[in-house]
């Protein structure tokens, strides 16, 4: 890694960092902080540029990261603290930021690994919730994650931080049409299971998109088979279009008076029930 010293906010590389941070170059991601950049190195993503300050070299962890970066073929820049503050997305920068290639997967990549357990995020709007769901999906042994159209970007700064780097490791197919996802899942015999708000009687039927389906308690469902678990947006749940395509609907029992769970919390409960049924047999991706 060749390193240049930069003290001006008008430097072209500094401007490029700011453009990428603002989302102007979709094929690149802006990463900030020691942990995310360590995760990116471990995940094997391609680095375009790395920027750091003297503060990074003041800690043992920072020195270890610098040592790892010596073997990364990319452009390096030693910034003044003032210039780092100009490109940083956080109030208290840790002294390191990077531009890396955005991971790129399609739905076939996500569904290729067997036995399949895939998460589908349907129109989630909160980046923190999506990032936490990605992190939980990886921890519970999911093969990958799919987002439907109108879902927040899983690689946005807040999503990436909430995922604790999982979004750089877990295959994610982004922004797909619900019907395309359903057709490909059915073609591969992957059952679509959508989380739902519970009806008054957990075994009663509900009408959804002109179809009558049973809503079962999540512990009654067989998660050992190939499944795609669908979680909907925070306020309204799984969209009607997506729930109408689901093979089964499930819910989490709750005490009276409780309207709903946070989608990340609901995801953790259901994903770990699936992992339990699968004997916590986590396959290495």
Q: Where are these predicted regions, by residue range?
A:
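Short, aromatic/basic amphipathic alpha-helical patches
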Residues: 60-72, 242
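RNA substrate-binding interface of SAM-dependent RNA methyltransferases
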Residues: 42, 68, 76-77, 82, ...
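Structured adenosyl-cofactor binding patch, chiefly the S-adenosyl-L-methionine
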Residues: 98, 139-140, 154, 159-166, ...
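Glycine- and other small-residue-rich loops at beta-strand/loop junctions that grip anionic moieties
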Residues: 6, 29, 122-123, 148-149, ...
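Boundary-proximal intrinsically disordered activation/regulatory segments immediately upstream
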Residues: 1-65, 151-153
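Amphipathic alpha-helical repeat scaffolds
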Residues: 33, 125-132, 261-266
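Active-site/ligand-binding-proximal alpha/beta "capping" segment
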Residues: 193-258
């Amino acid at each position: 890694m060749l390193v240049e010293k930069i003290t001006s906010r008008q430097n072209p590389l500094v401007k490029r960092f700011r453009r990428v941070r603002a989302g102007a170059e979709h094929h690149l991601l802006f990463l900030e902080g020691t942990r995310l950049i360590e995760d990116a190195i471990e995940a094997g993503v391609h680095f375009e540029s790395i920027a750091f300050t003297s503060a990074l070299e003041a800690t043992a962890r920072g020195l270890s990261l610098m040592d790892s970066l010596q073997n990364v073929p990319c452009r390096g820049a030693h910034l003044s603290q003032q210039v780092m503050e100009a490109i940083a997305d956080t109030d208290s920068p840790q002294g390191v930021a990077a531009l890396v290639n955005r991971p790129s997967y399609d739905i076939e990549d996500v569904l290729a690994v067997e036995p399949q357990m895939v998460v589908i995020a349907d129109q989630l709007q909160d980046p923190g919730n999506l990032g936490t769901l990605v992190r939980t999906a990886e921890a519970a042994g999911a093969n990958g994650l799919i987002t439907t159209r109108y879902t927040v970007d899983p690689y946005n700064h807040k999503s990436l931080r909430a995922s604790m780097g999982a979004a750089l490791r877990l295959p994610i197919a982004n922004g797909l049409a619900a019907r395309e996802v359903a057709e490909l899942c059915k073609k591969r015999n992957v059952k679509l299971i959508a989380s739902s708000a519970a009806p008054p009687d957990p075994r009663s039927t509900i009408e959804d998109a002109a179809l009558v389906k049973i809503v079962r308690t999540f512990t009654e469902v067989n998660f050992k088979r190939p499944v795609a678990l669908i979680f909907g947006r925070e306020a309204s749940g799984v969209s009607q279009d997506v729930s109408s395509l689901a093979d089964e609907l499930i819910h989490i029992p709750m005490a009276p008076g409780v309207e709903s769970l946070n989608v990340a919390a609901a995801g953790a409960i259901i994903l770990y029930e699936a992992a339990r049924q699968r004997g916590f047999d986590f396959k290495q991706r």
